[in-house]
Amino acid sequence: VVHRMPAHTRTVCLEFFGNAKDAVPSIVEIKDFMFAEQKRSGVLLAGLEHLDDRYLKAVGYATKSKRAAGSGSGLPKMVLIGDIAGENADDVARITSEVVRLANQRGGEGFVAVSAEARKKFWLDRKRTAAISRHTNAFKINEDVVIPLPRMADYTDGIERMNIELSL
């Protein structure tokens, strides 16, 4: 089934620093909020991608937050990139702001792109991770495993432990 894209789309980039266990619940909260909002207003989450710090490092991610200077590597622990789309521009703007607010409650910072060019820049890092994944086994587990969203923090911490143990 092919669906027509709604008339108005905004892209959010949400950066989270610190512990994954503190940040990951925002994925579930945003998903739940957006599914309810789609039923209420027709505004939908047209895509949501999670990038962890390994991917961010691999693609040379340019952190948008000013907080990066005090975070050791300068990279967020996790980034979410998502498209929020609908037929009513005001509804899309309001709901996008609410998604940023939800991220703020979990220590995240949100950045919003409105123009097609700015939106494309937000998605460019995700596109680069896909290219890297095609040419290396470094991220193979992400392609082969479906992780229940509420357990994403456990997965992230577990992979980090394995990376440290196996890097000896």
Could you say what each language-model-derived stretch is?
Residues 1-168:
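Noncatalytic alpha-helical scaffold of FAD-dependent oxidoreductases
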